[in-house]
């Protein structure tokens, strides 16, 4: 297969490197505005630098790993020539453009898979399979390493908080995938590293997101950009028959008071989820050849974005927000 990677940042570079080690991939095209970066990524992956037009014409499948504001154009162009696409999350930068692109994708009939690699994580998949019985509670832990404080926000506040759009969107997808239920209501408490309450969505550095699901299950997400020891992503599912955890390992970057301390915690998402990213690519390429179904769809990207918008509104208005309040796309609106 010939595969094009659009965007050669950290995600595009990672995808290119993994593709370069796959026997089924014959050629890799790297499309990137920064010529120096494009050449470096192409050299590491054993690919070649190409124009966007050549990539669309010659590639069998397209991976879009540009900044979110460029996704709509890249994905739209790819599906217009019948290419299957793996698009990094979020599907686009805003709810309105996500609705528009989802409509475009579903009308075109090609498949667009989102980069929700946690669906391919071995521990998450095992936990999902093990959670038999009536599911009562889902707990999601999503802690990113402590980062340098962001500049003070300026201009009008965004529709969706960066922490929800860029990080928690994975968790919003996972809770739907784990349970087979839709999120119906969201409430949020948020914090900052100095202990004060954020007043702008861009100031949120930690949050607790409570979610009511359509089947009666409750879900709680603990999200943070302030973990002092590394990258900690876990799930716990409690039903009337089982209690199952996924994501725990000797490298979970938390000081364990009840047993010896972990000494080599996960440092970031590329290290923690490399096997899942590889499995994601294998499944995507198989689906592109007609040998399976995509693991996720554009509509999954839309639903995750709707939850992120609802969470931001809950923060801003200090109330529970029903998902019915957030614009979406009914099946009848595809044509």
Positions of the model-derived regions?
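Rossmann-fold dehydrogenase core element
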Residues: 100-118, 134-140
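Predominantly a Rossmann-like dinucleotide-binding segment in NAD(P)-dependent oxidoreductases
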Residues: 118-200, 318
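C-terminal helix-rich "cap/oligomerization" subdomain common to oxidoreductases
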Residues: 61-64, 286-335
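Beta-loop-alpha module in the N-terminal Rossmann-like domain of NAD(P)-dependent dehydrogenases
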Residues: 15, 47-102
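N-terminal Rossmann-like dinucleotide-binding module
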Residues: 1-44
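Hydrophobic residues in well-ordered beta-strands that form the structural core
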Residues: 64, 87, 112-114, 221, ...
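Contiguous beta-strand/loop segments that form the cofactor/metal-binding neighborhood of enzyme cores
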Residues: 173-251, 278-291, 328-335
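Active-site loop of classical SDR/Rossmann-like NAD(P)-dependent oxidoreductases
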Residues: 33, 269-282, 296
């Amino acid at each position: 297969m010939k595969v094009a990677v659009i965007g050669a940042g950290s995600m595009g570079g990672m995808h290119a490197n993994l593709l370069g080690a796959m026997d089924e991939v014959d050629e890799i095209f790297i499309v990137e505005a920064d010529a120096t970066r494009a050449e470096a990524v192409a050299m590491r992956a054993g690919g070649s630098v190409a124009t966007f037009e050549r990539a669309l014409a010659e590639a069998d499948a397209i991976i879009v790993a540009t900044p979110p504001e460029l996704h709509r154009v890249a994905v739209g162009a790819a599906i217009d020539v019948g290419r299957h696409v793996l698009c990094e999350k979020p599907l686009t930068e805003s709810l309105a453009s996500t609705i528009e692109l989802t409509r475009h994708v579903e009308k075109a009939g090609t498949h667009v898979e989102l980069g929700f690699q946690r669906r391919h994580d071995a521990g998450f998949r095992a936990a999902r399979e093990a959670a038999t019985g009536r599911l009562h509670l889902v707990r999601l832990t999503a802690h990113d390493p402590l980062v340098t404080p962001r500049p003070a926000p300026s201009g009008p506040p965004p529709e969706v908080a960066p922490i929800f759009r860029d990080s928690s969107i994975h968790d919003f997808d996972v809770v739907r995938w784990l349970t087979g239920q839709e999120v119906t209501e969201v409430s949020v408490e948020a914090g900052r590293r100095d202990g004060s309450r954020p007043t702008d969505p861009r100031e949120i550095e930690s949050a607790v997101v409570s979610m009511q699901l359509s089947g009666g299950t409750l879900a709680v997400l603990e999200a943070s950009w302030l973990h002092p020891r590394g990258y900690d992503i876990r799930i716990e599912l409690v039903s009337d028959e089982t209690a199952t955890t996924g994501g725990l390992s000797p490298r979970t970057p938390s000081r364990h008071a009840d047993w010896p301390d972990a000494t080599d915690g996960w440092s970031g998402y590329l290290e923690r989820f490399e096997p899942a990213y590889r499995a994601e690519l294998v499944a995507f390429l198989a689906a592109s050849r007609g040998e399976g179904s995509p693991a996720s769809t554009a509509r999954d990207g839309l639903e995750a974005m709707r939850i992120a918008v609802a969470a931001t509104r809950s923060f801003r208005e200090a109330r529970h927000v029903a998902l019915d309040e957030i614009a979406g796309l009914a099946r009848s609106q595809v044509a």
